[in-house]
């Protein structure tokens, strides 16, 4: 093609306002000049069915002119068959996209008859070699079914670059791998990635050598089951001995290697480990940074940017937190780029770290900059924005809030509801699911607070769907709607519901009641806890634990780990004089496993400082008990200097959130003293669940409450019983109540009780209705 013709085509293609970088990217592909010419000649036709971004995506591959022509030829027919525009772009936007579109047209009917959905077909066709993959699925599906593979297995294997080769490889090597102990699930996991065929053959070749080096079958599957798994296995064999000499454990090597780009990450640990070590990064920190997608780049970026980040006030621990996720390199660079702008908008360093310290942290920071002002105009405060952005998928969550808030408002969801649902992993999907599934759930009798509780956790969208799917069956089994909400309103709620259905009969046969099952299942990780109870119950009984003990231990966040920790540590704790009741008391809370380990670790030092065994059990036997024990060790000397007795310290630390309460006493004690509160008052307010928040609320709202005629004693009474929420409720509704003739004495009497905030709201509700 002549230079003049190419130049002319560049000019014509530029009608799409292609930037120099975009034109260059297209031109570098095989047939790029032809693609530019095609775009310029057919831009009106293309624009009728594709967005600018779609055209660029398809054009960024070899021979893209053919793919774009195929979109024009096949797109309308595929649209009539139910394929979306994003499906068509996904199929066309790869090497061989034209052939893939034609293959979908030709084979979709036959694949549909075999039970493959439109989504399945788009997933398999939308990769390099998609046409060959669809044909291979048709040819090999019967053989796969005969060997016990499900349709989902076939789609997972086929739905990657080189899917056809992966399907053939599975049939070739599955018998041999099966003889070596690899399960069908292992084989699907290894094969179901780009380069799956090579990974399977590499497992076959290297497994004996890896086994001799001490790597388990689980390790091998973890390493092999990623894009580039074959290279990662070779790198483990080549670099493992040197890494072991450097002090890295086998488990650490497997963790670093077991991600996309694992081979490069291992090499980078060897190359940069010494330099990072000199800068003060520990081996554990290096492993944490390296053990993610893009770990090699993250290590290099830490080395490059650490000095500049430290100058900005970021500690090494915070740098590691931001770098130690998928996309950590981009997150660090984005922090450096955007931190000044974020600080100008009143985001604190802690906020920036929370947003950046997740998979996709870079995108989340950019979304905060982009959408923050609009969200503020909609009434969301900085804390709301940080809560929504500070999770995996935070960028998508912020975008979803902007897009869906008007409709959610129409459906009666409040701003706190939206923040609660959006502020988790998968928050964007949860908001979408609330809109799509909410009406059906309301028809079934679930209230708006129920829907928010179910949706407001990691996996909220799946939990809502599971409630719709399983509720009728669960009700037939005798579970009430409040039971269902309690089970699903946690991380992994969908799995917990399924586990209840699957395991309830066996658990009932073992003597567990329905309330027991709900208590165990109704926490984060409830599905695993139910299974662990089934697996470990006999061992617990043999050791003298009652059924009530098992339920108490299992019925919390992390119940599975707590059950295992009790079995592992009970003997040592018994040798140190802790009774079975003590062990159950410590283990039977959120984070019980960590609390048991902390008791073993810190008991000797605490004894030296005069704390009794009963003190230790009281401190450890609450949610966050491990942190509370550590906080006692850290702060006891300073608290002692300030006049707090050992009994005071135990009393403050021995509640949910005890660690935070001790820290709050240290932080706020002097100011509270200046405002007239004595040591006894401070202990009284701090020594409850949520004591830290109560002290902070007294500091913030105490002066205003004093101006309204409340005494110090009144404030202490409210804070010590109703806590921070009760103080805030008195602040908000006190004037309305006093206008209605209620005295301060009456208000304090109502607020200074457990649930005081709710009582105040109930008291004021009729008055607000009249206004």
UniProtKB/Swiss-Prot annotation:
Keywords: ANK repeat, DNA-binding, Plasmid, Repeat. Residues 83-709 are annotated as: BuD domain. Cryptic repeat - repeats lie at residues 18-49. Core repeat repeats lie at residues 83-115, 116-148, 149-181, 182-214, 215-247, 248-280, 281-313, 314-346, 347-379, 380-412, 413-445, 446-478, 479-511, 512-544, 545-577, 578-610, 611-643, 644-676, 677-709, 710-741. InterPro entries: Ankyrin_rpt-contain_sf. Cryptic repeat + repeats lie at residues 742-771. Cryptic repeat repeats lie at residues 50-82. GO terms for molecular function: double-stranded DNA binding. ANK repeats lie at residues 216-245, 348-377, 579-608, 645-674. After addition of nuclear localization signals (NLS) and a transcription activation domain, can be expressed in both human and plant cells and will recognize and transcribe a target sequence; more than 17 core repeats are necessary for this function. The N-terminal cryptic repeats effect activation, while the C-terminal cryptic repeat is absolutely required. When fused to the FokI restriction endonuclease domain functions as a sequence-specific DNA nuclease in vitro (called TALE-nuclease, TALEN, PubMed:24792163 or BuDN, PubMed:25004980) and with an NLS, in human and yeast cells. The keyword Ubl conjugation does not apply. Binds to dsDNA in a sequence-specific manner. Also binds a DNA/RNA duplex when the recognized sequence is in the DNA strand. Each tandem core repeat recognizes a single nucleotide in the target DNA via its base-specifying residue (BSR, residue 13 of each repeat); altering this amino acid changes sequence specificity. The protein is composed of 20 tandem core repeats (the BuD domain) with 1 base-specifying residue (BSR, residue 13), which recognizes 1 base pair in the target DNA. Belongs to the transcription activator-like effector (TALE) family. Bat subfamily. This is Burkholderia TALE-like protein 1. It comes from Mycetohabitans rhizoxinica (strain DSM 19002 / CIP 109453 / HKI 454). The gene is bat1.
